[in-house]
Amino acid sequence: MAVSEDRKFTKEQVYTLLEGAKGKTLGEVDKSHQFARTLESKKITGIAGDVIEQSVFGYKKDSKQECDIEIDGVLTEVKTTGVRVPKRDLKNVSGKKGEAYNIYLGAKEGISITHVTFEPPIQTDFDTSHFWEKTERLLIIFYEYKSYEVVPASGYAKFPIVDYCYNSFSQEEKDKLQNDWEIVSSHLQQVYHDYQDAEKRNEQLVGFTHLLRPNLLLIELVPGFKRTATGSYQKPRYRLKQTFVDYIVRGHFDKSRAKNEIVLKESFSSFAQLDARCHALTLKYKGKTLPELREMLGIDAKVKDISAKCVIRMFGTDCNRLNQISDFNKAGIIAKTITITPQGGRTEDMKLKHIDFEEWADRDADFEDSDVYDYFCEHSFLCPIFCEHDSKDPSKTVFEGFKRFAFDEEFIENEVRRTWEDSRNLIHRNELEWEYVYDKKGNKRMNNSGSYMGAPNFPKSSEYKVFFRGGADVSTEKTRTESVNGIRMLPQFFWLKGSYIAKKLQEIPYI
């Protein structure tokens, strides 16, 4: 595969071009007048990438499944992606600049790589696949999405180019990417073998992205394969998960991470390998009480969350929380210890994701394109299960094993979409209200901090499986830092209803 002469560069030329662009806004480097298109269209997907490719590098855009450029004879894919300081870290970056500021930057979204190949012959060799050819060597340019609201395409002109990096994957990461790709390839091969007729084959492929999703570690398939109103079929692209891109971004800006990173001594290249590891741990530790586990794993008796610490030690590592393990973070695996009764009940509500209200302000946003949709698609849960036989005697609590689940299409389309749409309607119709809590006499109740108790009328756990709840140690006027429709409130989070989790876990066998 060769590129045209206008796409051939030396590393020195690339350095000169990108160093000259760093610190400038996308609008300032737009020599090819990409932003002129925004006069006619408010939404232009990929306009930041168009500016980098056509203005900074100076080559024309194409849609070929080939690498963008050649650097000193080495084929390289150019990717432009947005980074941003999460709202939770805004207090930490106040007054900071340069490297001290940049270490707080995280990925705004995943990185789209290339179209999934559907036309036969289906590619079967990973090393020569379009996906790996475009992923093996990446030149990633970072711009800062300096907004917490959705901006029109023209607004990107104000976003600064922060930095860039050359990215190649470790052997461990390549193994994970290869396993993900082979899962997709094998599925397509089987469908093409079983269904020779194109229409029947397409009907069989509808929804296959959701079917494969629980088994993919680092890759996401978006959008879903489905029939459109015109009768054609919407086909997906390979995309690196936002969780994985976030790992890349933070590793680039925080050079000290490698020293402090918490990794498993024995990682896994597939969910099948992780499941096998969990099964082996279950065989070894199932039925052991917390005191027995503490002694077997060498854990100090003063440790507070003993069950979580036991699981951390089972995996051969040592940290404060399971979700500090980078192997889990890359793949969007949320590790959460669950304590049940012998009947399987009493599971607490689970706190999930902080809500950025930028998408709620965009009336034209589609659910399938939303950050909320991506979150529920990309994340799965690994649940170490403990059974509490006596609520008054923790020493009788025993380890039962592991269960793992992802959100299926039905749950996302029904429960998550319902919460997303209903909360957006409250905002767009100006129906969002503050609801005070009253005592039996009809007086407003006050909390221990002296503030009146209450919350906005967002979806509640009484009626929704996915609901809103504020997050702060105390609720005061000072901690109500979020403002929606002029109503001040605590930062809002998505929560998952405990009864749903309990029912889901009862339906799933132990690994």
Indicate where each model-derived feature is located:
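Nucleic-acid endonuclease domains
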Residues: 1-74, 80-511
